[in-house]
Amino acid sequence: MKNLALIDLFLNEYWIEKGLSENTVQSYRLDLTALCDWLDKNDLSLETLDAVDLQGFLGERLEKGYKATSTARMLSAMRKLFQYLYREKYRVDDPSAVLSSPKLPSRLPKYLTEQQVSDLLNTPNVEVPLELRDKAMLELLYATGLRVTELVSLTIENMSVQQGVVRVIGKGNKERIVPMGEEAAYWVRQFMLYGRPVLLNGQSSDVVFPSQRAQQMTRQTFWHRVKHYAILADIDADALSPHVLRHAFATHLVNHGADLRVVQMLLGHTDLSTTQIYTHVAKERLKRLHERFHPRG
């Protein structure tokens, strides 16, 4: 079978089996298509290549300047592909099993201080329907720690302003209920009453935060809006990431003494070790404060 056909088979079955988001599947597809192109160029087959071939492919990528993080992501996709091919008997072995992951630098997530978050959230002009929407989105994002994808796809039926909760279908189709708090609930209510009808202009939509065309907003559009407000708030937009408010949500909870397992549940992390990064952020902050203010720091 042709390489690309095998990749398509894997992605279609893996998508259904794991309940992955379209964005995750698209990321796998891009990486594995790059592998497929290299195999075709070198007249190699997914069914017969060996570990040396895979090492050659990864080595070429590193020589071309691809970062270790990119190579690690590629290797992760390859491993899942070859595990599938072995399980489904397209291969008699798994050549990726002997490959080592590149060493990754330990990086703490980017986040904003509480004052920076306050400045950012107070930037939109709430007299303008579009900016009232953005204000509500920013408040909800900081109050709940939702992923950007979860925020822009949030539907009316999955939110109760009256009860102050949102129902989120996260990665792997896992459901979680997250409280939104009074401040976020107030601004969402204001948007629903005064901003959303203007944006919809008589059209219907089941998403809470529609675009100006009454459609679901893209992640990219929301990210551009966040950067716009960051610049207005005199925050270095280049230092931000799309999940900056999610990271701020978690970091500020930990800073104020929240139990790590509660933060894990709110973020929708499967593994507690993923959440533990925020304890490191808190420790780094305490270390800097100690160095700054202690007489022997």
Curated annotation (Swiss-Prot):
SUPFAM superfamilies: DNA breaking-rejoining enzymes (SSF56349). Gene3D superfamilies: 1.10.150.130, Intergrase catalytic core. PROSITE patterns: CB, TYR_RECOMBINASE. Pfam families: Phage_int_SAM_1, Phage_integrase. The keyword Cell division applies. GO terms for biological process: cell division; chromosome segregation; DNA recombination; DNA transposition; resolution of DNA recombination intermediates. It is found in: Cytoplasm. Keywords: Cell cycle, Cell division, Chromosome partition, Cytoplasm, DNA integration, DNA recombination, DNA-binding. Belongs to the 'phage' integrase family. XerD subfamily. This is Tyrosine recombinase XerD. The gene is xerD.
